[in-house]
């Protein structure tokens, strides 16, 4: 409950910055294929931090979707695993084991408060020895991921077409879809 209150309070203070993710196309990503090595270099990104739920797979999936794994493999082959990190609010053991086995050099954020707290982004910058403004988070939520970007003074990409599986998890996926719609509505109206 404290995290929800924190998100609402900080979201109110950062509402104009959050509105940029809705109004500026350059800050949005509609498909993972839009995040290319060239775009990351153009945006001066040293490390791309990935959320899991909604970005790499639907909620509660144990591994990324096959097309996501192909994209991730291609990105790792071009920019290297050391330029990627994973920061999920649900670091389930199966997910961590998958990344440790399949992509062992991708940094796994651990031991920090969940988003929207900026601790995970700061941890990546500190671990990699780079300024925090050279870290970018790819996330599908405004009041968690994008808010943590604003609070950390880093960069972010708002993932506008998150993965979902309504057949497998109808209640959970509907809940998160409603949350995303409410976030967008509040930021559009109040920002």
Predicted segment positions?
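Asp-based, Mg2+/Mn2+-dependent phosphohydrolase catalytic module
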Residues: 1-43, 62, 68-69, 73-137, ...
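Asp-based phosphoryl-transfer active-site loop
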Residues: 43-60
């Amino acid at each position: 409950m404290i995290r929800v209150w924190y998100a609402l309070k900080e979201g109110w203070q950062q509402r104009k910055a959050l509105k940029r993710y809705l109004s500026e196309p350059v800050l949005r990503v509609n498909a993972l294929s839009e995040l290319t090595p060239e775009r990351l270099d153009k945006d001066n990104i040293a490390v791309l931090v990935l959320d899991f739920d909604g970005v790499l797979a639907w909620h509660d999936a144990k591994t990324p979707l096959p097309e996501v794994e192909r994209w991730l493999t291609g990105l790792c082959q071009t920019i290297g695993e050391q330029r990627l990190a994973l920061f999920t609010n649900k670091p389930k053991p199966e997910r961590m084991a998958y990344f440790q086995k399949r992509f062992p050099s991708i940094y796994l954020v651990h031991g920090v408060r969940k988003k929207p707290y900026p601790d995970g982004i700061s941890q990546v910058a500190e671990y990699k020895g780079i300024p925090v403004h050279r870290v970018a988070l790819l996330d599908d939520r405004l009041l968690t991921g994008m808010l943590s970007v604003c609070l950390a003074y880093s960069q972010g990409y708002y993932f506008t077409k998150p993965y979902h599986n309504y057949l497998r998890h109808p209640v959970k996926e509907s809940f998160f879809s409603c949350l995303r719609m409410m976030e967008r509505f509040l930021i559009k109206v109040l920002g």
